Amino acid sequence: MAATDLERVSNAEPEPRSLSLGGHVGFDSLPDQLVSKSVTQGFSFNILCVGETGIGKSTLMNTLFNTTFETEEASHHEECVRLRPQTYDLQESNVHLKLTIVDAVGFGDQINKDDSYRPIVDYIDAQFENYLQEELKIRRSLFDYHDTRIHVCLYFITPTGHSLKSLDLVTMKKLDSKVNIIPIIAKADTISKSELHKFKIKIMGELVSNGVQIYQFPTDDEAVAEINAVMNAHLPFAVVGSTEEVKVGNKLVRARQYPWGVVQVENENHCDFVKLREMLIRVNMEDLREQTHSRHYELYRRCKLEEMGFQDSDGDSQPFSLQETYEAKRKEFLSELQRKEEEMRQMFVNKVKETELELKEKERELHEKFEHLKRIHQEEKRKVEEKRRELEEETNAFNCRKAAMEALQSQALHATSQQPLRKDKDKKN
C-alpha cells in the first residue's frame, strides 16, 4: 500500500456507532421545530417572466396567484430591455409569502435583438452578487435578508406552431446555467390541439439539439417522483390566462369567452394551466428555491471566489488558509500595481517627450515665421526709404525750378517797369 493511501486510511473518520435510547429524549420534535421556525420567518419566492410584450405575462401571474397585481402598461417601443421587479406580501392560511415578480419589459421589441438577453443575465448576476456580498460580511444577517435571487424563469413562447425563434434559443441557452427555466406556450387557445402537440414535440427537440438545459421536475423524492415524471413529459406547458369569470352550467369559472365557445383556464382538457400551477407552486416550489441556492448560486459563488484567489484543496495537498490566500493576492496586487505604475510612468515620459518635440517644432515654425516677417519688414523699409529719397530729390529740384522761375519773373517785372521811364527821357530830349 502506498504512503498516501496509508495517510488517507489513518486520517479517515471512524464510522459512527448506532445506539439505542433507554427512553424518550425529545429530538423527534425537530421537524415540528423546523416547521414552526419556517412559518414564523416566512418564505420568499422570486419569478422572472421573459417573453414578448403583450404575450400575457401579467395576466398569467394574476391567474396563478388568484389576485390582481398592480402593473404598469408595457409599451412596444422600448429602446432596450429593462427588468422591472415588483414585490408583494401574500398570505394563505398561516403561511406568509414574499413574492417578487420580475418582468423583462421590452424583450423582443427591438430591431437589433442580438443583446436582448444581456440585461436579463446582468440582473440575475447582480442578485447573486448582492447575496454573496451579504455572506462575506463580518456581521452578516441572512436571517432577515430579503433574498432577491431568481428562483424560476417562466419563459413565454409565442404560439407560432412552427418552431422556436432564434432569440428564444439564444436567450434560454444564456440563462440555463443561471436560473431554473420552465418553458410555457402562451395563449395556447390560438392554435389547434393537433398543432399544439406537434409544436411541443418540435420545441423539446430543438431545446435538446441546441443543448438548452431546462428545469426538470425532480424524481428522486418518492413522494412526488411519479407525478413529476408524468409532468416532465408534458413540458412545455400550454397555458391560457384569464381573470374574468364566465358562467358555465350552474357555476362561475375563470375562462375566456369566444364566439365559438368558452376556454376554461382550470380545465385540463383545454390547457395545462392547472399542471403549471401544481408543479410550480404546490409540488416543487421548495425544490426550485433549493436548486437556485445549491446549484446556480453555488456555481456563481465558486467562480467569484476563484477569481478572488480562493480554491478548494485536493486530497493530497494541504488546505489553503485564508492568510496564505490573502498574502498571495496581496503580492499579486502589489506586483500588478508596480507594473501599472511603471506603465503610467513610461507613458508620462513618452507624453512629455512628444510634447517637447511638438513645442520645439512650434518654436521652429514661429522663428521661421518671425524671420520671414522681419525680411518683409526690412524690404518694405528699404522701399520706403528709397521713395522718401526720391521724394526729397524731386522736392529739391522743384524748389530750384521755383527759385529760377521767381528770379526770371522778378527780372521781367523790373524790365517792364524801366521802359516807361526811358520813353519820358526821350521825349524831354
From Swiss-Prot:
Keywords on record: Acetylation, Cell projection, Coiled coil, Cytoplasm, Cytoplasmic vesicle, Cytoskeleton, GTP-binding, Membrane, Nucleotide-binding, Phosphoprotein, Synapse
Annotated spans, G3 motif: 103-106
Domain of life: Eukaryota
In-chain residues carrying the UniProt-annotated modification N-acetylalanine: 2
Pfam families for the chain: Septin
GO cellular component annotations of the record: axon; myelin sheath; presynapse; septin complex; synaptic vesicle membrane
Record note on quaternary structure: Septins polymerize into heterooligomeric protein complexes that form filaments, and can associate with cellular membranes, actin filaments and microtubules. GTPase activity is required for filament formation. Interacts with SEPTIN5. Interacts with CDK14, SEPTIN4 and SEPTIN7. Interacts with VAMP2; the interaction inhibits interaction of VAMP2 with SYP. Interacts with STX1A.
Family recorded in the similarity comment: Belongs to the TRAFAC class TrmE-Era-EngA-EngB-Septin-like GTPase superfamily. Septin GTPase family.
Protein name: Septin-8
Gene: Septin8
